A protein has these predicted regions:
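Class I (Rossmann-like) S-adenosyl-L-methionine-dependent methyltransferase catalytic domain
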Residues: 2-74, 79-131, 149, 153-156, ...
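A short SAM/SAH-binding and catalytic strip from SAM-dependent methyltransferases
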Residues: 139-152
Length: 251
């Protein structure tokens, strides 16, 4: 006979899954998906970097290579796979996850050309509903996903994504800072907007302790600002034990 504790846990898990499904299929996220789909269908250069890995992520690859032998890496929202290929080349078993098929096909082609296909697994799925078992990865890289997630959906993201890390695993996050501009002279009166049908969130340094401090140890925060680009690159580590969750609400 199942215990009341089991039933409560099962009910809570089912409720969280239902919320994640509803969030992933919200009108805003459907429009956002449509925006990225159209960019790939256009067939030209993307508005974001798509070939060379970002220096901050290269640093993390070097760090992981020194500390973990034969580790597993998840590139969340991998796009055309510039970081997926980086970690595979460094010798790691790497999973590239994206919710669009078009960029995954590009990764597959690049992996074959670089003779890295045996180290790479590609999955189609949403960050809020990743089709992966918990406690799987030594490192999770999110370059440019979290800043497209509404604040109301952060708890779903944290549950889904951080749960994929092994205890003691590393989490590298790259997101827009408030210095990011879509175009010269852009003015904003709030820390989020909807631009060309996709949601963008802009962060300041103190945000990361508030959002992630209840679940991760923050190891380093690097700010990058060049031209219109403004980013924070944050390296965190999931503790071996359980930390308190951070309560968040709002937009």
């Amino acid at each position: 006979m199942r215990s009341a504790r089991y039933e409560a846990q099962h009910s809570r898990a089912a409720s969280e899954t239902s919320k994640a499904i509803a969030a992933a299929n919200s009108p805003l996220y459907r429009r956002q998906r449509g925006y990225f789909t159209r960019v790939y269908e256009a067939g030209g250069p993307t508005p974001w970097p798509s070939t060379e890995p970002t220096p901050s992520v290269v640093k993390v690859a070097r760090l992981l290579k020194r500390r973990v032998r034969g580790g597993r890496v998840l590139d969340l929202g991998c796009g055309e796979g510039r970081h997926t290929l980086l970690f595979a080349k460094a010798g790691f078993s790497t999973v590239g996850l994206d919710y669009l098929l078009a960029p995954l096909k590009m990764v597959a082609t690049r992996a074959r050309q670089a003779r890295l296909a045996r180290r790479i697994r590609l999955l189609i799925g949403d960050a809020l509903l990743p089709p992966i078992k918990p406690d799987t990865f030594d490192l999770l890289v999110d370059y440019g996903c979290f800043h497209h997630v509404k604040k109301a959906d952060w708890p779903n993201y944290l549950d889904a994504v951080l749960g994929l890390l092994k205890p003691g695993g590393y989490f590298h996050l790259s997101v827009f800072s408030t210095k990011f501009k879509h175009y010269p002279g852009e003015r904003r009166t709030r820390n989020w907007n909807v631009h060309r049908n996709h949601y963008d969130r802009f962060f300041v340094k103190r945000d990361f302790a508030r959002i992630f401090g209840g679940r991760c140890e923050i190891l380093a925060i690097e700010e990058e600002h060049k031209g219109l680009d403004g980013f924070f690159h944050v390296l965190m580590r999931k503790p071996s034990g359980m930390l308190l969750r951070t309560d968040m609400g709002g937009r």
